[in-house]
């Protein structure tokens, strides 16, 4: 369903000023996409060559948000608002069934849960060892991540994003910071 939801999404931009910041080749590709679909303007899809440059370069925050929200809700209960009402593309029940089957498989093979089964052929001895490793790793990494986050937020404010960084701003702000 993810591919169906990805393939079905097209956002048409009709105002060229909404494309400010996008590289010329991305704008040309969007114009070609629109033309191929019999549309006028610039058509953006959720395929990565179309989607990611918008996240990375588009100064239009609303455009970044629209594509971001459509991308992260593909094949979910939120898909219909972006996929022409195709609620049959919702993978929620498929995911629930997959989790149930994994749990059933683990128990049939004598494990407490799927995590324990998954760890059987791996270096970690058990789930608690993995939890301990991840907790320790998070404690060690947090100060560095916090420093980077603070730097990114400060830079975002200098770009006029005074209300904070939203998920659809991350690639854009990071790219701008990298260019500085």
Please state what every model-predicted region is.
Residues 60, 94-95:
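Generic alpha-helical segment signature
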Residues 71-84, 88, 117-123:
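Membrane-interfacial helix termini and the short, flexible loops that connect transmembrane helices
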Residues 35-80, 170-177:
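Active-site-adjacent "gating/activation" loops or surface patches in catalytic cores
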Residues 1-46, 97, 101, 107-180:
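Active-site-proximal, well-structured secondary-structure segments within enzyme catalytic domains
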Residues 85-92, 98, 108:
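Recognition helices and adjacent regulatory flanks at domain boundaries
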């Amino acid at each position: 369903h993810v591919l169906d939801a990805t393939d079905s999404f097209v956002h048409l931009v009709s105002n060229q000023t909404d494309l400010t910041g996008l590289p010329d080749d991305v704008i040309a590709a969007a114009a070609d996409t629109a033309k191929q679909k019999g549309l006028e303007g610039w058509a953006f899809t959720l395929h990565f060559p179309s989607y990611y440059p918008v996240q990375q370069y588009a100064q239009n925050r609303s455009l970044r948000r629209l594509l971001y929200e459509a991308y992260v809700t593909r094949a979910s209960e939120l898909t219909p608002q972006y996929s022409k009402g195709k609620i049959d593309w919702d993978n929620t029940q498929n995911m629930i069934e997959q989790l149930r089957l994994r749990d059933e498989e683990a128990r049939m093979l004598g494990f407490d849960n799927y995590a324990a089964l998954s760890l059987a052929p791996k270096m970690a001895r058990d789930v608690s060892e993995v939890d301990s490793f991840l907790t320790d790793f998070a404690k060690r990494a947090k100060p560095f991540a916090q420093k980077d986050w603070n730097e990114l937020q400060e830079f975002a404010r200098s770009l006029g994003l005074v209300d904070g960084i939203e998920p659809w701003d991350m690639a854009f702000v990071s790219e701008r910071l990298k260019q500085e």
